């Protein structure tokens, strides 16, 4: 339900609510039905995602208040916010906050270290949800919010995003090759595969 809400939301506040709500089942799956180190894996997952959530919330509030100050109209509507004429410096700061939050979910190097632990400790069903659905939401966040809301900053940051994507591709593939645990192989190969996705997104102009 929360994932469907994230896809359908045309309101920034609703997007944020659904974005956070979709993480709750994964916390419970790992924390309640995970392996021996499930508490450690869950705590690491919570800390990483909470850091990203705080950054996104701060950027969201600033964007809405800035738009209200310049237009006199307070709204969370994405169509209205995407038309805001923000200075490049402001766009860069806001995109950085959103990008860090999304990059944690992807996850991109060097924000990836929660994923191998979460994969290993999660039950098989949790690993399937992680690899098959949840990780892709980070790339969707870039497409839905990051690039459309801050187009000038996105163009300026493309070289950085592409560099991190290439590092993720090579790093994830190399580590996947030397793993003996199937879940760790999936975790590191997912980092590599999603690096390709991010490289493709960053190649768009």
Regions found by a protein language model. Name each.
Residues 34, 118-120:
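Short helix-loop-helix connector
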Residues 41-44, 122-132:
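Membrane-interface alpha-helices at helix entry/exit sites of multi-pass transporters
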Residues 51, 115, 136:
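Conserved hydrophobic/aromatic pocket- or pore-lining residues that grip, position, or stack substrates
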Residues 54-112, 117, 142-160, 203-204:
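Juxtamembrane/interfacial segments at transmembrane-helix boundaries in multi-pass membrane proteins
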Residues 116, 138-144, 148-205:
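Acidic, glycine-rich loop-and-beta core segments that form the ion-binding/anion-interacting portion
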